């Protein structure tokens, strides 16, 4: 005899999409950069920019309205489920980056194709390698793996696209 299949309770995602604020995109994200790194980007040798996961960058890259919503609903299982499944995202998407030095004597505007967070662990580094052909973190990862280091640094990463403008030669 057939066993009746009970449908799983579906989280009313649409309801939370309406209730929950959406993280606002950042049209132009200002970042300080060493000139030699800017030149690597221009030559096409640097495809991803990394920034340490710090309070300063969290303040700029996480949407306060979404964070406040999540704080107000931290005991709501459906909201937490929607967050885990990626239907609610507090990280703001960056559309372009305005790189410059301290004195603003030069600038480099670059399209940002994607941005997210990562830890210095094999899975995350492999993602960056496979998707953006970036090997900047390979040595640091190998070192931590060799030392069997438990605590791993976290970063924000920005996948760089087309050059939008510059005054660098």
Can you say where each PLM-predicted feature lies in the sequence?
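Structured alpha/beta reader/binder surfaces that contact nucleic acids or chromatin modification marks
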Residues: 5-23, 27-169
């Amino acid at each position: 005899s057939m066993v009746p299949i009970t449908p799983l309770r579906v989280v009313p995602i649409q309801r939370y999409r309406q209730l929950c604020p959406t993280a606002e995109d950042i049209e132009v994200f200002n970042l300080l950069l060493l000139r030699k790194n800017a030149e690597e980007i221009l030559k096409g040798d640097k495809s991803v920019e990394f920034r340490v996961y710090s309070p300063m960058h969290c303040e700029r890259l996480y949407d306060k309205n979404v964070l406040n919503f999540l704080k107000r609903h931290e005991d709501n299982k459906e909201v937490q489920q929607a967050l885990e499944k990626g239907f609610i995202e507090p990280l703001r998407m960056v559309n372009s980056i305005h790189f410059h030095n301290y004195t603003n004597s030069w600038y480099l505007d670059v399209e940002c194709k994607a941005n997210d967070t990562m830890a210095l662990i094999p899975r995350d580094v492999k993602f960056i390698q496979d998707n953006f052909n970036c090997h900047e973190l390979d040595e640091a990862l190998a070192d931590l793996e060799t030392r069997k280091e438990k605590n791993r640094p976290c970063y924000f990463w920005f996948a760089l696209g087309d050059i939008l403008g510059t005054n660098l030669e």
